[in-house]
Amino acid sequence: IRDVERSRGLGDVYKRQELGIKQIKEFFQLNLSSELRLRRVTAPLFVLKGMGINDDLNGVERAVTFPIKDLGDAKAEVVHSLAKWKRLTLAEYHIEPGYGIYTDMNAIRADEELGNLHSLYVDQWDWERVITAEDRNVEFLKEIVTRIYAAMVRTEYMVYEMYPQIKPCLPQKLHFIHAEELRQLYPDLEPKCREHAICKKYGAVFIIGIGCKLSDGKKHDGRAPDYDDYTSKGLNDLPGLNGDLLLWDHILQRSIELSSMGIRVDKEALLRQLKEEGEEERLELYFHKRLMNDTLPLSIGGGIGQSRLCMFYLRKAHIGEIQASIWPEDMRKECKEHNIHLI
């Protein structure tokens, strides 16, 4: 953890900090809902194992699992995120194109590498919206991302109105770039360092094509093959209809990822991506059968980190200043030495 120059807008007064967190969350989700025409729904904390509903994220993270006594010890998994569950829910609620849902998602990611931005506990707004086949293009993706970013800019101004010491720093315009273009721009840097470099330059960036193979044969970052479409043609005929939204954090002096989102796979993209990853056996799972049988709507969706968003607006150096979680003792000690008080 860096010994950083931190804003004292809220000082160490927990009462004002908790009020700030509450107001940010209420204001932002109201703006998100109205921007994208989303209805709030209640989401599960866990789902049955073996249904293909839980998300695999990068494909290697272990889900927290437990047996259910009344179901003959059938296994349940605490969710990683709700990408596939939301799409099933859109079908169940018969949501029309142009409308969608959002939810408060709480998850446990036991394999997370803990640090300033990463916790065992994940809280985010998970959202999903029904689209048409004509919407499955990069221009529509950019339109939706721009609307989400507009809600972020408005929220930052609300924080400034509440706490004038916290000056707005977000640029009015979001910069779009494909992961391949980013690689060519900074060929000698690793993917995370490319993110830091481009974010420092523009302040707010959306990187398209997360999960697709770049010209060097590597991926910018991993994605599970069965929710985001990262292989269909997108920006400048490069593959990918998904991406990550990143902001430059002036406190940590690095980029932070606030949202991961994308146009979801249709049948063709699902088959293509499962084959590419050698995971065609997933087609036997419940979610995948529903998709292949045309009983799920086309959709776009993503997640927006609640704690990270609050951390950014309130100029905090560690996510543990926003949320309660478990941290290594040496991390707590180091934070305390730098006047960073973890909840």
PLM segments and residue spans:
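Conserved alpha/beta core surface patches that mediate binding of polyanionic ligands
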Residues: 82-124
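Alpha-helical scaffold segments that mediate packing/assembly in large oligomeric complexes
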Residues: 153-191
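A translation/RNA-centric and nucleic-acid-associated enzymatic feature enriched
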Residues: 108, 179-343
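Single conserved hydrophobic/aromatic residue that forms the stacking wall/gate
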Residues: 1-14
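Generic, well-ordered alpha-helical scaffold segments in large soluble proteins
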Residues: 27-35, 147, 151, 312
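N-terminal "assembly arms/tails" that initiate or stabilize quaternary assembly
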Residues: 15-90
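A generic structural motif
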Residues: 126-137
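Compact, glycine/acidic-enriched structural inserts
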Residues: 140-159
